UniProtKB/Swiss-Prot annotation:
Enzymatic reactions: (2E,6E,10E)-geranylgeranyl diphosphate = (+)-copalyl diphosphate
Residues the record lists as binding Mg(2+): 287, 289
Membership in a protein family: Belongs to the terpene synthase family.
Name used for this protein in its record: Copalyl diphosphate synthase 2
Keyword field: Isomerase, Magnesium, Metal-binding
Length: 740
């Protein structure tokens, strides 16, 4: 496995302008450029040779392993025109024209979603050139009229005076407009690298019409870089940097490449603008897809970044990826939706973007149309559905990883002006490493759970209804799904034991135990003397002894991690939590309900002891955590957890909870209206918690992440009575099933 890690690390350290496959279509346009010295020969004869040497058996050019009619015909026609322009390769041209004649009618049958970028602009222009060259194809094909109509619609959306004076996506397809535009104006929109919006074909056309030296330099560099051919777009540096980081994270292997990922994101951050970014640095045109991916990754890694960039893509009540686009791309809206998931409080633009993107994606799902115009991937519908059904505030990392390992493919194909591949984004090495890592962690987790089972069997907890073996498995799953790294084995065990104990105690006092018993348990925790338990019930004695044993054990381990005794701090954690349980019990028995503010301030989630105890075992040295119970991040976690639990309760009419209190304070509301208000309050608290987690502060990041993980766990499994049904399949996928 470590050889795979080093191979990936070498890839990451070699990132530059992007690894991308070559394009026959764009190479054909470069091959058409006449020599700038005035001689009757091509400026790039090596590109002409590449065309003659790379025709496929059926007479077309393109991706050998994937046939799409639009792509193959467009490339075949471009190559045939290039060869005919220089009166060479007659047999190759003849074979290409045979392919075009045979295949052109099939364009009517192909899904227009798979039409290459700018096809409706460049293909009609090439048809006109083919007619001028008297190439033998059927110019009366009905499908051509449809394409001409699409071209007209596109040009109506972006008028020619705009194309010639302002950066738009049509700069990427100027070869389709070369007879009508003013090249003296358009060349002023040239990118710093000499290209026209990083398109080799568009730049080659500009070079033909202007002889611009920077265009020539750009193409010379590309032909040399790609060994006599060119890609459909270059550079793709920001795109590659971002999508690699995204894939590594979703595959669960990013922890091996912390420094390399930081370098990649530092690079992207240098080119971030207040209008967003595109696929390449210094682009005069921004797009919502790359901007969304950059925003989400940068923000989640702690970079200071404003969501105001999304105003660039807001048009009235909707959002677009590009101004003047023909239609929405599923992946663009998918990434916009994902970006909205890292929203901080008050960020209205992200709220609007997320709402729009979700509505669009839900509509596509209902229509069974979750496929995209930019990528042909293994399971895009599954990716989108998982994101819609599992929003970030209710998603556990390892479950998402397990799902994505099944969805990731090493051979995804992207749709640009032609089909292309990104070998550093999609490759078998990533997948092999992800599978090996997941199976390694899963095997370790299984051993840890067996250790927990032995502890459970040796304890007296099984006599209580609330301490079931299935619940033990569920609490361990919550740890394995969030703090899964091999080196955090003690943290997982401590988390599992603490949450298991607190859930069991909570259930006991909800259904069986008396207020006096709870007071006795708290008194015993204060005395902390297993040999002097006082006059209390047998059940309280057992609960205290089991709690005493695990805290003592955790204290011994904690000394090794912290270099000092943490026993007092661990006892205080349990005293605080039990006291909050007592307060809630007293409120339930009282005729006077607390205010919502009082109720939430006093609420301490059943998961709090697990979070605060585990903090000592995640590799960070903590000076003190005495004030953590009153800290903002702890309060936010508890509040968010309590609110989400209350919104899923089955006892809205009788129990003391956020909804009944909210109704009491707002009697004009219906029950459903109060529920909606409390759900909105829960969402706002999750936003606050995310903000607090990502801000720099005295508490180490690894510790803050525990609080966020805990709130997400409570969002995934709100209410102990619903845990079993919802968890069983998740537990199986993460703990029991190896990845094959």
């Amino acid at each position: 496995m470590w050889e795979l890690v080093e191979t990936v690390r070498s890839m990451l350290n070699s990132l530059h302008d992007g690894e991308i496959s070559v394009s026959a279509y764009d190479t054909a346009w470069v091959a058409r450029v006449p020599a700038l010295d005035g001689s009757n020969k091509p400026q790039f004869p090596m590109c002409l040779n590449w065309i003659m040497n790379n025709q496929l058996e059926d007479g077309s050019w393109g991706d050998r392993d994937l046939f799409l009619t639009y792509d193959r015909i467009c490339s075949a026609l471009a190559c045939a025109i290039a060869l005919k322009t220089w009166n060479t390769g007659d047999k190759i041209v003849h074979k290409a024209l045979e392919f075009i004649r045979k295949t052109m009618p099939k364009m009517e049958l192909e899904d227009s979603t798979h039409m290459p970028i700018g096809f409706e602009i460049v293909f009609p222009a090439m048809i006109e050139e083919a007619m001028a060259l008297e190439l033998d194809i059927d110019y009366r094909e009905p499908v051509l009229q449809t394409i001409y109509a699409e071209r007209k619609k596109k040009l109506e959306r972006i008028p020619m005076n705009v194309v010639q004076n302002y950066p738009t996506t049509l700069l990427h397809s100027l070869e389709g407009l070369h007879k009508t535009i003013d090249w003296d104006k358009v060349i002023k929109l040239q990118s710093p690298d000499g290209s026209l919006l990083f398109s080799p074909a568009s730049t080659a056309c500009a070079l033909m019409h202007t002889g611009n030296e920077k265009c020539l330099q750009y193409l010379n560099n590309l032909v040399k870089r790609f060994n006599c051919a060119v890609p459909n777009v270059y550079p793709v540096d920001l795109f590659e940097h971002l999508w690699i980081v995204d894939r590594l994270q979703r595959l669960g292997i990013s922890r091996y490449f912390t420094q390399e990922i930081k370098s990649a994101l530092d690079y992207v951050y240098r080119y971030w603008t207040d209008k967003g970014i595109a696929w390449a640095r210094g682009s005069p045109v921004q797009d919502a897809d790359d901007t969304s991916m950059a925003f989400r990754l940068l923000r989640s890694h702690g970079y200071d970044i404003s969501p105001d960039a999304f105003k660039t893509f807001q048009e009235g009540d909707s959002f677009v990826c590009f101004s003047g686009q023909a239609g929405q791309a599923v992946t663009g809206m998918y990434n916009l939706y994902r970006a909205s998931q890292v929203m901080f409080p008050g960020e209205t633009i992200l709220e609007e973007a997320g709402s729009f993107a979700r509505k669009f994606l839900e509509g596509k799902r209902q229509e069974n149309q979750l496929y995209d115009k930019w990528i042909i991937s293994k399971d895009l519908p599954g990716e989108v559905e998982f994101a819609l059904d599992n929003p970030m505030h209710a998603r556990l990392e390892r479950l998402a990883t397990r799902r994505y390992i099944d969805q990731y493919a090493a051979d995804d194909v992207w749709i640009g002006k032609s089909l292309y591949r990104m070998p550093f984004v999609n490759n078998p090495i990533f997948l092999e490493l992800a599978k090996a890592d997941f199976n390694m962690c899963r095997a370790l987790h299984r051993k840890e759970f067996q250790q927990l089972e032995r502890w459970y069997d040796e304890s007296s907890l099984s006599m209580f209804k609330g301490f079931s073996r299935s619940k033990l498995e569920q609490t361990f799953y919550s740890a394995a799904a969030t703090i899964f790294e091999p080196e955090l084995s003690p943290a997982r065990l401590i988390w599992s034991q603490c949450w298991f104990i607190s859930l069991g105690i909570n259930e006991y006092f909800d259904h069986q135990g008396s207020t006096k018993e709870l007071e006795d348990l708290i008194n015993n925790v204060e005395r902390w003397n297993v040999n002097s338990l006082g006059n209390c019930s047998a059940e309280v004695k057992i609960l205290f002894v089991e709690l005493y044993n695990i805290v003592q054990n955790h204290s011994k381990q904690g000394f090794l991690y912290q270099g000092r005794s943490i026993g007092g701090a661990l006892r205080e954690i349990w005293k605080t939590w039990l006291s909050s349980l007592l307060q809630r019990t007293k409120w339930k028995m009282s005729d006077n309900n607390p205010t919502l503010e009082e109720y939430l301030k006093a609420s301490h989630s059943s998961i709090e002891p697990a979070v605060r105890s585990t903090m000592y075992f995640v590799g960070e040295t903590l000076a003190t955590t005495g004030d953590i119970k009153d800290s903002a991040i702890c309060q936010m976690m508890n509040t968010a957890s309590r609110l989400v639990q209350d919104t899923h309760t089955d006892k809205v009419d009788s129990s003391l909870n956020s909804i009944t209190i909210y109704l009491e304070e707002n009697p004009q509301l219906t029950k459903s209206e109060a529920l909606s208000e409390v759900q909105a309050l829960a969402n706002k608290n999750m936003q606050k918690l995310l903000y607090e987690t990502l801000q720099p502060g005295a508490l180490p990041q690894a510790c803050k992440q525990l609080f966020l993980n805990a709130a997400r766990i409570m969002n995934v499994f709100p209410g102990t009575n619903k845990v079993q049904a919802k968890l069983s399949n998740h537990v199986k996928r993460v703990l029991s099933q190896p990845v094959l």
